Amino acid sequence: MGLTDIKRELKKLDKDKLIDLIADLYKKNKSVKEFFDFYVNSDERELFNKYRDKVFLAFYPKRGYRFKLKDGKQAISDFKKLGPSSDLVADLMLFYVETGVKFTNDFGNIDESFYSSLETTYVAALTLMRKENLLDKFADRASKVVSDTSGIGWGFHDYLSNVHSDFYADYSDDTDEPIEQQEKGGIIKLGGQ
């Protein structure tokens, strides 16, 4: 049964039956409950913090020492489905990468698939930031991720550094003061001095 069929059947229901159906879904399905909780009371920051905690626990579980990247990625995916602002989605994605980098620095090199997951999320986060004109807002954190990966294996640092350069090349060109050298060995003029 497709969405068109569902819509056709829902249109046949009267208001009370529709309310009962939604209430039943609300009780039985956790993701529906979260969606309607967000829809009715859209406190994005509170919801963001909840999913941020889920991402953190994927790397640093309360019990045991086994990280679960899948849980962290699922938290990001579930958060996106609720329809929060792009700003908070980008923030959560970047937090995933930051936490993964911290985990590596705390416990040593992991494996290639671990770094691949972080790389993919970093690229997705920066892509979203560019699309939504958020690169400036997250510039310091995006740079810190790269600097914090220095010395990490599997070509991880080099890859993130290249990605960062690709996304922030225009950004750094726009913010640098123009420097002109009058002649070789001459005085360097900064800005319009």
Model-identified regions with their sequence ranges:
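Short, structured coil/loop segments at alpha-helix boundaries
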Residues: L3-D5, N29, S85-S86, F107, ...
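Residues that form generic nucleotide/phosphate-binding pockets
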Residues: E9, F35, Y39, K54, ...
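Charged linear interaction tracts used for macromolecular binding and regulation
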Residues: F59-F138
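Residue-level signal for alpha-helical context at structural boundaries
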Residues: K28, F36-V40, K54, K73, ...
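N-terminal interaction modules that seed assembly of large macromolecular complexes
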Residues: G2-R66
